């Protein structure tokens, strides 16, 4: 089992719509640690740490629009 940490920035209509909460929920379902926070430019920063397959699953979820 390989443990990794990764960062992603999500752009678009992601502030004020519950996106951070939904992302945190998905990360918790995968047993990941990290954080999700709003950025001044309107994007959201996501840092996720855990088993590589579970981090990749979260990234796939983000790529599909959350």
Swiss-Prot record:
<keyword id="KW-0378">Hydrolase</keyword>
<comment type="similarity">
    <text>Belongs to the acylphosphatase family.</text>
</comment>
<dbReference type="InterPro" id="IPR001792">
    <property type="entry name" value="Acylphosphatase-like_dom"/>
</dbReference>
<dbReference type="InterPro" id="IPR036046">
    <property type="entry name" value="Acylphosphatase-like_dom_sf"/>
</dbReference>
<feature type="active site">
    <location>
        <position position="20"/>
    </location>
</feature>
<dbReference type="Pfam" id="PF00708">
    <property type="entry name" value="Acylphosphatase"/>
</dbReference>
<protein>
    <recommendedName>
        <fullName>Acylphosphatase</fullName>
        <ecNumber>3.6.1.7</ecNumber>
    </recommendedName>
</protein>
<dbReference type="InterPro" id="IPR020456">
    <property type="entry name" value="Acylphosphatase"/>
</dbReference>
<dbReference type="InterPro" id="IPR017968">
    <property type="entry name" value="Acylphosphatase_CS"/>
</dbReference>
<feature type="active site">
    <location>
        <position position="38"/>
    </location>
</feature>
<dbReference type="GO" id="GO:0003998">
    <property type="term" value="F:acylphosphatase activity"/>
</dbReference>
<feature type="domain" description="Acylphosphatase-like">
    <location>
        <begin position="5"/>
        <end position="66"/>
    </location>
</feature>
């Amino acid at each position: 089992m390989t443990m990794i940490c990764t960062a992603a920035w999500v752009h678009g209509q992601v502030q004020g719509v519950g996106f951070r909460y939904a992302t945190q929920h998905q990360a918790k379902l995968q047993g990941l640690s990290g954080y999700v926070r709003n950025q001044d430019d309107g994007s959201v920063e996501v840092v996720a740490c855990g088993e590589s397959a579970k981090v990749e699953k979260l990234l796939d979820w983000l790529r599909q629009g959350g």
